[in-house]
């Protein structure tokens, strides 16, 4: 029992630290010397990076943040042994990486909105669901020109898609 608790704690800590890597902050600081938290919306995420550096860097930060979201979940799926049938360890990793992205220990607990990291976690939990969610997000965002609208709609449908594709119950609960 102690080993299982320690394993889940290790999953959470590692995922949180990976999630805390402030991708947008690092890129904007390297390119302009600015602290992205002092411009635009104050968020360190891809949308605010787009305001400062343009569309190419928006896509770069989206990709890096999605990879940052996926990595801890993939590691948990490969190496964690606790609650395999329920999908518990990968979901703990997903939650921790989202918390890390939005409340980075490296930025005095400030961060991004966790949209790209969230998509990365869903892609890693179930890549088919992740692709459907990413497609919905892209179409809605392109159509409305609002990242937030695309994000909300995509995330609202994610638990239903996860459920209908027979994913572990913890994955469905995570998306809900």
Language-model features and meaning:
Residues 1-11, 73-92, 123-129, 163-174:
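Helix-coil boundary and interhelical linker segments in multi-pass alpha-helical membrane proteins
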Residues 24-27, 100-110, 137-144:
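C-terminal ends of transmembrane helices
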Residues 25-58, 111:
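Cytosolic, membrane-interface loops and tails of multi-pass inner-membrane proteins
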Residues 34-45, 106-119, 146-154:
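Short, non-helical or kinked segments that cap or interrupt transmembrane helices
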Residues 47-50, 58-61, 71-77, 104-108, ...:
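Generic transmembrane alpha-helix signature in multi-pass membrane proteins
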């Amino acid at each position: 029992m102690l080993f299982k608790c320690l394993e889940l704690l290790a999953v959470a800590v590692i995922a949180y630290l990976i999630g805390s890597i402030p991708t947008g902050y690092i890129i904007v600081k390297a390119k302009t010397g600015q602290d992205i938290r002092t411009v635009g919306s104050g968020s360190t995420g891809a949308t605010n990076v787009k305001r400062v550096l343009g569309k190419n860097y928006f896509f770069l930060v989206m990709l890096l943040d999605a990879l940052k979201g996926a990595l801890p979940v993939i590691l948990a799926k490969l190496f964690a042994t606790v609650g395999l049938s329920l999908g518990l360890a990968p979901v703990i990793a997903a939650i921790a990486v989202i918390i890390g992205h939005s409340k980075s220990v490296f930025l005095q607990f400030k961060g991004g909105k966790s949209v790209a990291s969230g998509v990365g976690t869903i892609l890693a939990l179930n890549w088919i669901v992740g692709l459907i969610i990413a497609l919905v997000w892209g179409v809605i965002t392109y159509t409305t020109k609002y990242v937030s609208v695309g994000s909300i709609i995509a995330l609202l449908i994610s638990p239903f898609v996860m459920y209908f594709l027979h994913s572990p119950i913890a994955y469905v609960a995570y998306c809900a």
